């Protein structure tokens, strides 16, 4: 089993020449490779895409076997992938998914990091995160809009609708956390983001998600103060340990205007630097003494949360951004760790109630002009949404593509299928140079059960009910998605989430029209269904307006 190979450099093919037998198999092949593009993945030589150890394939032998299987797969066959390893090819039918993926799933009693890590060492499992192992990661752009929407809503709720002259403090500049500085600037705020790895800071600078960096807290605070005084948003990366920096801010009596965190705290061995440790010591001991690392990291997380709670008590709007940091602190004896809310119940849930979530698409041509044309089509089909248009304009101006050109755009039930059909027609007419794939994050309205994140504080107490993502995966399979995935542990770690993903190919065919219409209606509809079942009036109203047939939910 080879997990590290510094000689491998993977990039997705572009253009219209196929390696596989059709676009339905070429698409997952290119997206798998795109996940490991050096401009996309955090540690591609280790197959790590983002989020601690979120991988695209179990090992390099499995990667090669997946590529070989996709290359020979027929359009009436389905490839099964078990925790990053291809395990079977079966005859199905043309409208069935070409790939079905299950990653990191464990029987609940054994769904712990200790048990998973033992399996991982033996080469029997792979942590797929959300979009790493489901081959639809698009770089930090993937969560930029969701983060932007969160920060904008924080501005509405706490600062009268404007973040001008305000600043956000956060930690983590990895594949997910790296979206925060750009999202803050787009929302009108400055951002001070602490990151312990210089390589992560460099990647965010290179891809345009971060404006500048320093290894001096004094310099970072000077830059933030100047930007806030001038009301010119600026993002500053600070090389350091976030728990240490928060303690120092408290000692100095300096309060940010907004506070959150997106370190990889969900994984206490691989995702969080203990206080007082160098990165080199951490990297070495993650292999030689993982239990020592975990204990030290958990202690640091408890200190981190103590500081956040202090700022919260001082009136600073403080929010958990879904990395399970509060849970880790709770387990370390911080009984009030959940005194500040998660971002979904605080700011995002009304969108989920209408099936609105992180819709994304990727141009398999590799040509940025295809994304420009689809951006214009979104504006044409949704003409009256000024907020959406403003987002698309900002995205076109400020977001650098990583790997294949892509766009994230939060839209919901009633719009997703219209956009998909329009994109397919553009492929058919030749307006787009090659097919487009449409997918989403697993963080969506109907595709996840995560009591410390997406389903925190549900109105009916159904936070931990995971039937919903299972039903979502089954329905997307039945509807004809091109590939469907079912994962465990994404975002918040082992034992704390189950979630499903889907991707569908717009290859320009009439057969694709039918699949697109089914999938891109049914997928967001499950989110409306889930929230209507929990008793949210917005979701009930949406379900009725859209004519959903929900026996047992709608009277």
Swiss-Prot record:
Residue ranges the record marks as coiled coil: none
Function field: Catalyzes the conversion of urocanate to 4-imidazolone-5-propionate.
Keywords associated with the record: Cytoplasm, Histidine metabolism, Lyase, NAD
Originating gene: hutU
Compartments reported by the entry: Cytoplasm
InterPro entries attached to this UniProt entry: Urocanase, Urocanase-like, Urocanase_C, Urocanase_central_sf, Urocanase_CS, Urocanase_N, Urocanase_Rossmann-like, Urocanase_sf
Active site: 409
UniProt family annotation: Belongs to the urocanase family.
GO molecular function: urocanate hydratase activity
Entry GO terms, CC: cytoplasm
Biological processes, Gene Ontology terms: L-histidine catabolic process; L-histidine catabolic process to glutamate and formamide; L-histidine catabolic process to glutamate and formate
Keyword NAD: yes
Record's cofactor remark: Binds 1 NAD(+) per subunit.
Name of this chain's protein: Urocanate hydratase
EC number: 4.2.1.49
Binding residues annotated for NAD(+), in chain numbering: 51-52, 129, 175-177, 195, 262-266, 272-273, 321, 491
């Amino acid at each position: 089993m080879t997990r590290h190979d510094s000689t491998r450099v993977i990039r997705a093919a572009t253009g219209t020449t196929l390696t596989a037998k059709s676009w339905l198999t070429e698409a997952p092949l290119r997206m798998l490779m795109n996940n490991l593009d050096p401009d996309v993945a955090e540690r591609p030589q280790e197959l790590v895409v983002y989020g601690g150890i979120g991988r695209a394939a179990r090992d390099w032998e499995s990667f090669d076997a997946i590529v070989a299987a996709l290359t020979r797969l027929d359009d009436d066959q389905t490839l099964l992938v078990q925790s990053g390893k291809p395990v079977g090819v079966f005859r199905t039918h043309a409208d069935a998914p070409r790939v079905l993926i299950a990653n990191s799933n464990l029987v609940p009693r054994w769904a712990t990091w200790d048990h998973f890590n033992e399996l991982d060492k033996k080469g029997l499992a792979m942590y797929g995160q959300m979009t790493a192992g489901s081959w639809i990661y698009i770089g930090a752009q993937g969560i930029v809009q969701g983060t932007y929407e969160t920060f904008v809503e924080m501005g509405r709720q706490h600062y009268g609708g404007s973040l001008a002259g305000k600043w956000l403090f956060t930690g983590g500049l990895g594949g997910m956390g790296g979206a925060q500085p750009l999202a803050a600037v787009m929302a009108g705020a400055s951002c001070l983001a602490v990151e312990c790895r210089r390589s992560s800071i460099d990647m965010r600078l290179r891809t345009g998600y971060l404006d500048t960096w320093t290894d001096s807290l004094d310099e970072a605070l000077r830059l933030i103060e100047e930007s806030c005084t001038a009301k010119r948003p600026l993002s500053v990366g600070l090389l350091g340990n976030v728990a240490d920096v928060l303690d120092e801010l408290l000692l100095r009596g300096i309060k940010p205007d907004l506070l959150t965190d997106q370190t990889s705290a969900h994984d206490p061995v691989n995702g969080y630097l203990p206080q007082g440790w160098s990165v080199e010591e951490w990297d070495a001991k993650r292999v030689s003494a993982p239990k020592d690392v975990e204990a030290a990291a958990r202690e640091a997380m408890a200190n981190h949360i103590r500081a956040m709670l202090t700022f919260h008590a001082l009136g600073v709007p403080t929010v958990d951004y879904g990395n399970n940091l509060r849970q880790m602190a709770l387990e370390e004896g911080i009984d009030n760790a959940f005194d500040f809310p998660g971002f979904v119940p605080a700011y995002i849930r009304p969108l989920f109630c209408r099936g609105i979530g992180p819709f994304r698409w990727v141009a398999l041509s590799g040509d940025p002009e295809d994304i420009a044309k689809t951006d214009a089509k979104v504006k044409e089909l949704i003409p009256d949404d000024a907020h959406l248009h403003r987002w698309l304009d900002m995205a076109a101006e400020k977001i650098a593509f990583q790997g294949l050109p892509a766009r994230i755009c939060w839209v919901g039930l009633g719009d997703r299928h219209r956009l998909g059909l329009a994109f397919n027609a553009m492929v058919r007419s030749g307006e787009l140079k090659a097919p487009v794939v449409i997918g989403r994050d697993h963080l969506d309205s109907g595709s996840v059960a995560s009591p410390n994140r997406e389903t925190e504080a549900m109105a009916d107490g159904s936070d931990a009910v995971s039937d919903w993502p299972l039903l979502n995966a089954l329905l997307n399979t039945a509807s004809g998605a091109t590939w469907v995935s079912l994962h465990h542990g994404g975002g918040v770690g082992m034992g704390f989430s189950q979630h499903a993903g889907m991707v569908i190919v717009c290859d320009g065919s009439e057969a694709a029209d039918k699949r697109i219409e089914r999938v891109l209606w049914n997928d967001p509809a499950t989110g409306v269904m889930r929230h209507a079942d929990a008793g949210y009036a917005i979701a009930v109203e949406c379900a009725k307006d859209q004519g959903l047939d929900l026996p047992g939910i709608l009277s």
